[in-house]
Amino acid sequence: MTASSGTSVTPSVTWPPSLWAATAPPGPALPVLEGDETSDVAIVGAGFTGLSTAIHLREMGVAATVIEAAEPGWGASGRNNGQVIPTLAGHDPSAMVRRHGEAGERFNALLRDSASDLFDLARRFGIAAEAEQAGWVQPVHSPGRFKLAERRVKEWSAIGAPVELLDRAAVSAMLGSDVWFGGFWNRTGGHINPLAFARGLADVALKLGAAIYARSPAVSISRANDRWTVKTAHGSVTARALILATNAYTGEFEQQLAPDIAREVIPVLSWQMATKPISNNIAKTIIPDRQAVSDTHRELYFARWDARNRLVTGGAAMWPGAGGVNLREPVAERLKRLWPQIGDVEFDYVWSGYVGMTPDSLLHPEVPGFPRIHQLGPNGFAWIGCNGRAVALSISLGRELARTTQGAAIETLGLPLSEPRPQPFQSIVRKVAPFALPLYRRLDAKEI
């Protein structure tokens, strides 16, 4: 790998008006890519997945260069709610095995350990990200859905996950609310300040010897003479292997970089909101042990505490006409329904970001989507489709992507490789997605 030489001064990146941008420690000072560089592995995207890949490559002794359009954590990695959840949005382990056989079993093991992987990495490198491994709770929003909790506890317990079934009284005591009908608790989950974590990952990657270039949007990707070349406005990186780790923001590249990937992933806008600091007397009655919480509503009911007594929640990713002003009142009313003791709710921070959804999760909301690792060509890989569960998963997938570049056998990977499936009607799906909320509400109201 050639030495980093970027020195250009460019306009600073504009950050969203988020709680995380206001509270995260500064990230590392990074150069712009100028000139032609070489590396063993080129990584496009400095979010959780790209940075995790770089860290795992450097721990293998492999040269890694990361190219980022803005700054580490600028995209979804630094904008999300920060919940560390070691499951998919709806699938149980048996569904993964039905779809992928032995590869599904390997993925289940990867997913089972994903939250612990994240917290272990944070502890190992001393990343200051307000990490709290207090567990993740999924309460059920109707009596009939208690059998979902029973099934999930049974299936996850069978593969060694530390999960516990909670009856209605236990959920009420744990969360400080009597609106739910039971649920289950995974002790390995929790929450982080996601932007602080992304910046911490960048620091770790640099200390391990990776190169990271910021404010350097990729403008083309090509392959010749058994090498991949990623070009930016002022330079290029040529490498034996390529990782495209842009997920929901792949669409920004459209036809220029990976058109099949850009036409497959569906970026859906998701809103996050942080209340004003809540008094200790009230805070100790709402999720007193500070677990991360997201229930069984498809409309997305979720909440967690930050380090400053702010309750961090959000609105549905598919709220027609969604905007910061439009969401304040309905989300405030929701919090008051869940926790009447909270009183009047005011939000200090409201921000948004894109979630990478797979088409199956949008076109068939009763059948949640699977994440995918695609092979772009020899030694070229991409992943898409977090479907709202990328925080924990992306760290473990970074390890798997690092392994793919070093010739790991397909039958050992935690997620099977697949070919991209560009969607001919992607533009239509993107336009109608914001209006799926009425359907989601009907599905939520239907007892099972």
Model-derived segments and spans:
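Extreme N-terminal leader/targeting segments of oxidoreductases
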Residues: 1-41
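Helix-loop-beta segment of a Rossmann-like dinucleotide-binding subdomain
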Residues: 30, 128-138, 170-204, 208, ...
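N-terminal Rossmann-like FAD-binding beta1-loop-alpha1 element of flavoenzymes
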Residues: 39-66
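Glycine-rich FAD pyrophosphate-binding loop
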Residues: 59-79
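Active-site substrate-recognition segment that forms the wall
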Residues: 84, 124-132, 218-220, 235-378
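Dinucleotide-binding Rossmann-like beta1-alpha1 core, especially the glycine-rich loop
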Residues: 87-168
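Helical element adjacent to the flavin cofactor pocket in flavoenzyme catalytic cores
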Residues: 147, 151-157, 179-240
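C-terminal catalytic lobe of FAD-dependent flavoproteins
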Residues: 321-445
